[in-house]
Swiss-Prot record:
Originating organism: Influenza A virus (strain A/Victoria/3/1975 H3N2)
Subunit architecture: Influenza RNA polymerase is composed of three subunits: PB1, PB2 and PA. Interacts (via N-terminus) with PB1 (via C-terminus). Interacts with nucleoprotein NP (via N-terminus). Interacts (via N-terminus) with host MAVS (via N-terminus); this interaction inhibits host innate immune response.
Record keywords, A-Z: Cap snatching, Eukaryotic host gene expression shutoff by virus, Eukaryotic host transcription shutoff by virus, Host gene expression shutoff by virus, Host mitochondrion, Host nucleus, Host-virus interaction, Inhibition of host innate immune response by virus, Inhibition of host MAVS by virus, Inhibition of host RLR pathway by virus, Inhibition of host RNA polymerase II by virus, mRNA capping, mRNA processing, Viral immunoevasion, Viral transcription, Virion
Function: Plays an essential role in transcription initiation and cap-stealing mechanism, in which cellular capped pre-mRNAs are used to generate primers for viral transcription. Recognizes and binds the 7-methylguanosine-containing cap of the target pre-RNA which is subsequently cleaved after 10-13 nucleotides by the viral protein PA. Plays a role in the initiation of the viral genome replication and modulates the activity of the ribonucleoprotein (RNP) complex.
Sites annotated Mammalian adaptation: 627
Gene from which this protein is expressed: PB2
Keyword Disulfide bond: no
Main location: virion
InterPro entries: Flu_PB2_2nd (IPR049110), Flu_PB2_6th (IPR049114), Flu_PB2_C (IPR049115), Flu_PB2_CAP-bd (IPR048298), Flu_PB2_middle (IPR049111), Flu_PB2_N (IPR049106), INV_PB2 (IPR001591), PB2_helical (IPR049113)
Entry's localization field: Virion; Host nucleus; Host mitochondrion
Family: Belongs to the influenza viruses PB2 family.
Cellular-component GO terms for this entry: host cell mitochondrion; host cell nucleus; virion component
Residue numbers covered by motif Nuclear localization signal: 736-739
This protein's name: Polymerase basic protein 2
Length: 759
């Protein structure tokens, strides 16, 4: 205060003002500061000072032929003096105005294409809605956010190659365009930018904006997707916020959002299968998001979310070194600990084996709606400073921190038995047991924690067991702060390992992630997610399982047919029939399976009874473990549309309808595809055509291995013999002819020989 009074006093004297405004600067240090180096030290001042001159701009001499010396108002537009040290002309800012109004106009067709990101932004803002301004304290925390809406997800190197190829195709230098997205973008951009007159450098800059994700570490309270970040300066200040709804979505946000949903669905599904890791990989590789392979997106997309990171770990990609517990991301900021197994007793005298972390450590905890700083010693919470959007979010963070601290009073606060299980019906590990228990009800935990008197610290208040704020008392070691805790800013990624139960560990063996950490929130994806894996058929309900199962049989009919006759057990055990079992009433599954398997065996034994339609229709029922019984069925029940519906053993029904003439299959009125090859009607034709160049030797001979399909015959060498499966599910022995000349006669003799071989 004193200094300010003194300065005011000085300024009131006229001499002070004069010295400060009129005298020249002749102090060597100052002159040095502003004149050494090429870097402009005070750009805004320099600009103001330059623009106050008459001719602040220099231009090529040609300008004098293209711009008149004076404008309509008679003001001079350029000077006859040339610029010192170059052969350029000195030009007035008025010349720019004249040029903008009267200069030549070139084609504008490329502008929206090159400056696409800007044009799109204008559209989003035009259609966006700005709501009221609210004045309130903003809890902002720095998060790594995407500041560049509408970009593809290429790496800097990939983008560089694309840009060089599009903008400077004739430049020397090796460019390798390998990824699908690189090739597509290059082709598209080359077509768009034909005969483009905009400066190549500008085009390159704009392409970079379109191709590469740019992230910044910014203070945010609210939406973090790129369409919100681009208006951050309009929507949140230090003490105010303005409601805003974006006027359009951008693909990069849609991909991030859909990727998280796909990853969560896949991890949830994989964790209940017999081999979670193998299943997860199979699903990641067979899933597409918005038409792009999920594995390609995972390789390029830096989104950090528990399920996404589990998928990345499974693919051998590096992920962030922070770990997840109770939906919060923990990052150790100092300290260290060693792990030791210890047995503890709950309040219900149940024994738990927990891995205790011995040592003093500090962590930041960042969740969706709350953040905290946690300091802990061995089985003791030293201090927790938490901030959050509302009471509920703050309570969630406190529960997670209390459980994580492993304090005895927390374990003693357990009432009742701990027996929580995961989706696969396996018991959760002790730490997650405790977490689930207190997430259900934390009353006893908060009551037993203990209370202390607190000092008055700016920006911090105490919190009582019933979650009310207080300035005098607080739960031991716990304070609520107005300030948020920043997210971990580093983008460093580490090598991790994953076990078959999808637990992800760092190289020291600390568990970073496990399926228990995957959120149960279900959203609706913005881009179409196509799961080709049979494990995901259930996600859209029973009807989808039914349609997909039959579609799979039809698509793979050639191989299915061979397995059906040669190796039925292997066929029945195929994982593609797994989802179907949930549609068959549990009590009767075994009987159905036994019945269908017996029926199929009769078909194999009695020649000429092979019935394509019936095999396709009944095959999924044979997958359940069979029960031997004498029961016969004329129809089999499946549970779809909320009730049991019947599939007729012989003939069509609303559930399964096969049209023999068109070979189209309709399931519940939905088209399930067309059977490419149906030998029932076209026996003689198919075989005689296909067996050209082969001699039929007689009945099947097991010494020549399993039967091949007609398509596989082409791989035989001349003179080689093989069993082959023909139309009616029958197997004959053939030999590939040594000479090509006799091929013509084969088609006539083939038909006769097949009949002889079979009969």
């Amino acid at each position: 205060m004193e200094r300010i009074k003194e300065l005011r006093n000085l300024m009131s004297q006229s001499r002070t003002r004069e010295i400060l405004t009129k005298t020249t600067v002749d102090h060597m240090a100052i002159i040095k500061k502003y004149t050494s180096g090429r870097q402009e030290k005070n750009p805004s001042l320099r600009m103001k000072w330059m623009m106050a001159m008459k001719y602040p701009i220099t231009a090529d001499k040609r300008i004098t032929e293209m711009v008149p010396e004076r404008n309509e108002q008679g003001q001079t537009l350029w000077s006859k003096m040339s610029d010192a040290g170059s052969d350029r002309v000195m030009v007035s800012p008025l010349a720019v105005t004249w040029w903008n109004r009267n200069g030549p106009v070139t084609s504008t067709v490329h502008y929206p294409k090159v400056y696409k990101t800007y044009f799109d932004k204008v559209e989003r803002l035009k259609h966006g809605t700005f709501g009221p301004v609210h004045f309130r304290n903003q809890v902002k925390i720095r998060r790594r956010v995407d500041i560049n809406p509408g970009h593809a997800d290429l790496s800097a190197k990939e983008a560089q190659d694309v840009i060089m190829e599009v903008v400077f195709p004739n430049e020397v230098g090796a460019r390798i365009l390998t990824s699908e997205s690189q090739l597509t973008i290059t082709k598209e951009k080359k077509e768009e930018l034909q005969d483009c007159k905009i400066s190549p450098l500008m085009v390159a800059y704009m392409l970079e904006r379109e191709l590469v994700r740019k992230t910044r570490f910014l203070p945010v309270a609210g939406g973090t997707s790129s369409v919100y970040i681009e208006v951050l300066h309009l929507t949140q200040g230090t003490c105010w916020e303005q409601m805003y709804t974006p006027g359009g979505e951008v693909r990069n946000d849609d991909i991030d959002q859909s990727l998280i949903i796909a990853a969560r669905n896949i991890v949830r599904r994989a964790s209940v299968s017999a081999d979670p890791l193998a299943s997860l990989l199979e699903m990641c590789h067979s899933t597409q998001i918005g038409g792009t392979r999920m594995v390609d997106i995972l390789r390029q997309n830096p989104t950090e979310e528990q399920a996404v990171d589990i998928c990345k770990a499974a693919m051998g990609l590096r992920i962030s070194s922070s770990f997840s517990f109770g939906g919060f991301t923990f990052k150790r900021t100092s300290g260290s600990s060693i792990k030791r197994e210890e047995e503890v007793l709950t309040g219900n005298l149940q024994t738990l084996k927990i891995r205790v972390h011995e040592g003093y450590e500090e962590f930041t905890m960042v969740g969706k709606r709350a953040t905290a700083i946690l300091r802990k010693a061995t089985r003791r919470l030293v201090q927790l400073i938490v901030s959050g959007r509302d009471e509920q979010s703050i309570a969630e963070a406190i529960i997670v921190a209390m459980v994580f601290s492993q304090e005895d009073c927390m374990i003693k606060a357990v009432r009742g038995d701990l027996n929580f299980v995961n989706r696969a019906n396996q018991r959760l590990n002790p730490m997650h047991q405790l977490l689930r228990h207190f997430q259900k009800d934390a009353k006893v935990l908060f009551q037993n924690w203990g209370i202390e008197h607190i000092d008055n610290v700016m920006g911090m208040v105490g919190v009582l067991p019933d979650m009310t704020p207080s300035t005098e008392m607080s739960m031991r070691g716990i304070r609520v702060s107005k300030m948020g805790v920043d997210e971990y800013s580093s983008t460093e990624r580490v090598v991790v390992s994953i076990d078959r139960f999808l637990r992800v560990r760092d190289q020291r063996g600390n568990v970073l992630l496990s399926p228990e950490e995957v959120s149960e929130t279900h959203g609706t994806e913005r881009l179409t997610i196509t799961y080709s894996s049979s494990m995901m058929w259930e996600i859209n309900g029973p009807e989808s399982v039914l349609v997909n199962t039959y579609q799979w049989i039809i698509r793979n009919w050639e191989t299915v047919k061979i397995q059906w006759s040669q190796n039925p057990t292997m066929l029945y055990n195929k994982m593609e029939f797994e989802p179907f079992q949930s549609l068959v009433p549990k009590a009767i599954r075994g009987q159905y399976s036994g019945f269908v398997r017996t029926l199929f065996q009769q078909m194999r034994d009695v020649l000429g009874t092979f019935d394509t339609t019936q095999i396709i229709k009944l095959l999924p029922f044979a997958a359940a473990p069979p029960k031997q019984s004498r029961m016969q069925f004329s129809s089999l029940t499946v549970n779809v549309r909320g009730s049991g519906m019947r599939i007729l053993v012989r003939g069509n029904s609303p559930v399964f309808n096969y049209n023999k003439t068109t070979k189209r299959l309709t399931i519940l009125g939905k088209d399930a595809g067309t059977l490419i090859e149906d030998p029932d009607e076209s026996t003689s034709g198919v075989e005689s055509a296909v067996l050209r160049g082969f001699l039929i030797l007689g009945k099947e001979d097991r010494r020549y291995g399993p039967a091949l399909s007609i398509n596989e015959l082409s791989n035989l060498a001349k003179g080689e013999k093989a069993n082959v499966l023909i139309g009616q599910g029958d197997v004959v022995l053939v030999m590939k002819r040594k000479r090509d000349s006799s091929i013509l006669t084969d088609s006539q003799t083939a038909t006769k020989r097949i009949r002889m071989a079979i009969n």
